[in-house]
Amino acid sequence: MLAMSHQTASSRLPEWARRTIGTASQVSTVEKIVKQRSLHTICEEGRCPNRAECYAQKTATFLLMGPVCTRACGFCQVAGGKALPLDPQEPEKVAEAVALLGLKYVVLTSVARDDLPDQGAGWFVRTMESIRARNCAVEIEVLTPDFRGEEACIATVVAARPVCFNHNIETVRRLQSYARRAATYARSLAVLAAVKRLDAEIFTKSGLMLGHGETREEVLETLLDLRKVGCDRVTLGQYLQPSKDHLPVHKYWTPAEFAELGAVARDLGFAHVRSGPLVRSSYHAGEPE
């Protein structure tokens, strides 16, 4: 049984964890293109603190297969419940949005779709094919659920050759059952290991959200475990409680602590590291280290 401290962080958000949502002029272009096509972004559904910055740069992370997840992890803003029917036009709509925004690097993610026979793996591929049909030079990163660990699903996405395959381990081993629903530490490591086994040339990536009660030593252990399965890239960010119904914040890690963890990650051999309070999975994903 998980032993958790009842101590939580102050309800007052530190200044360094605050960011403006931006002005209408900054976000209007991306919002218009996305909303006109009834598309979804994790920027909006996940209430990402960086969405104004990304929208101002005309970038977004597209959320495939609807805004409703078949899981309901305690930290996540995305709605959980009965998943919606797939929109057969979604892959082409995403491709059109990518073209209109002039994107050279695209991140595709999705809700968990445990209701689908292939967990949604084929939908990633269809969307990638639609994007490449318009511009084969676009680089595509995928941020996938764990596909219940089914290697056939992982192989389906790997065969489409994304430039980077991201699957987030989210938290340290001890806190998995506390923070994640229907997911495990070992399975997430196995997903990343499978990608490297299937195609060693594809970059693999994972991320952690700190603030659930983990210790520095546990974070370092997780970074080491990620490196053991060949993970190339990592993101470290601060968990921010979306609402009172979500898991509480147990600690606000400081910018200095994030900087130190980022330096440790680089020393461990991660080739691409993003570490800071407001860092999220696709933050500056297409930019060099």
UniProtKB/Swiss-Prot annotation:
It is found in: Cytoplasm. Its main location: cytoplasm. PROSITE patterns: RADICAL_SAM. Pfam families: Radical_SAM. [4Fe-4S] cluster 2 binds at residues 69, 73, 76. It catalyses: [[Fe-S] cluster scaffold protein carrying a second [4Fe-4S](2+) cluster] + N(6)-octanoyl-L-lysyl-[protein] + 2 oxidized [2Fe-2S]-[ferredoxin] + 2 S-adenosyl-L-methionine + 4 H(+) = [[Fe-S] cluster scaffold protein] + N(6)-[(R)-dihydrolipoyl]-L-lysyl-[protein] + 4 Fe(3+) + 2 hydrogen sulfide + 2 5'-deoxyadenosine + 2 L-methionine + 2 reduced [2Fe-2S]-[ferredoxin]. Binds 2 [4Fe-4S] clusters per subunit. One cluster is coordinated with 3 cysteines and an exchangeable S-adenosyl-L-methionine. Its cofactor is [4Fe-4S] cluster. NCBIfam families: lipA, PRK05481.1, PRK12928.1. Belongs to the radical SAM superfamily. Lipoyl synthase family. This is Lipoyl synthase 2. It comes from Gloeobacter violaceus (strain ATCC 29082 / PCC 7421).
